[in-house]
């Protein structure tokens, strides 16, 4: 009952924020927050939107199999955020876009525009469903199975809660709710770390030294080119993951486009980029501490990395407070990710697919429809997924965000004009070719593609657009 009471109290606060920010909200407020968002709130809220429930569960467990090598990817993230801030944001602000995929219509044509928007809908719906599924499974495990509540009911109830507090204010509401949820998530993480350190009988300086001396604190891998943990694979993948999953993601860019000016948007992007490194370092450090904790009580580590955090909390030895903190942290992380995803999906559908940005009736209907489809995706993923959740998201991104990367790079960095009618076929063929290459190379050479599959996918799309016959040239590169 404590967990249920915690969630209800948390949700009441979100509803209060929604009531305040949703007053007299029209479509412009829902889609763009009237372009009046303070940059520092956007920057802080984006931490919670990116560090989802998946991060809360999976990143601490990564140290079991790959030590702290995930930090190599996080270092790449920093350069990726600077690239987005100074290469993509100027284009979006100059064109005064509501959705970033409108750029594809201006530069490449209507088929490319619809293709990009459609791929985003699939990519974001899939990735957000993965993240949200984590919270639903954990709530089932901790509370709801005891009361015999089926998993589908849990999913429907939580999505309905999100719909309630986002249905009026949209992105204007989310700027504030994401700030609140990020505060809750980070406080929960820090307090959990403190509680684990206290249980181990250490001071904070002693714990920091113990983590640094632990064999699982190893970060850099330079000597194994075959390994997925090789530095250059992870670092370069981190750069492109951010460019694609933030810079080409309507969800993330929609918040940035609510800032008053380009300069403020760039400040918020760079600030957030730097903040991502210490945040993930805390999650990985928690993973090392949890392994120390299991060793100290003589308990075997779980078979699956994703269960490291869950087993520590479910065991009960860390106390009821940790259970409450964990619930707050993971619900905050998941809600801040899912609510913005539903808003971005609704925006893209209304503006890009239907071409009716001022139709409030359509927006309200689309918001309900997107929520229903979101529920279906969660249920599908719950019953078919068996891989590590964080890897699942990035694998999905490699196949669905890759064509977006190729289309945007082609439009921004060349003066050529694509054969617009062929773009949908290119966007479908590229992921299929990547899947075939990944399978063949793995079986014949033993080389395993990591997150760099995203770059390969984008490169194939770019080359196909570049070399296939184009219609008559008449458009210049936006980056002239």
Identify the function of each model-found stretch.
Residues 61, 65-168, 256-395:
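Helix-loop-helix junctions that connect adjacent transmembrane helices in secondary transporters/permeases
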Residues 17-23, 124-132, 136-153, 164-167, ...:
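Hydrophobic alpha-helical segments and their helix-loop junctions in multi-pass secondary transporters
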Residues 13-27, 87-101, 164, 168-171, ...:
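Juxtamembrane interface elements at the cytosolic ends of transmembrane helices
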Residues 6-17, 81-85, 120, 137, ...:
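Hydrophobic core segments of alpha-helical transmembrane domains in multi-pass membrane transport
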Residues 1-56, 166-169, 182, 188:
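Membrane-interface "cap" regions at the ends of multi-pass membrane proteins
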Residues 39-46, 107-116, 181-194, 274, ...:
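Small-residue-rich segments of transmembrane alpha-helices in multi-pass membrane proteins
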Residues 26-43, 151, 395-467, 476-480:
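C-terminal membrane-solvent junction of multi-pass transporters and transport-like membrane proteins
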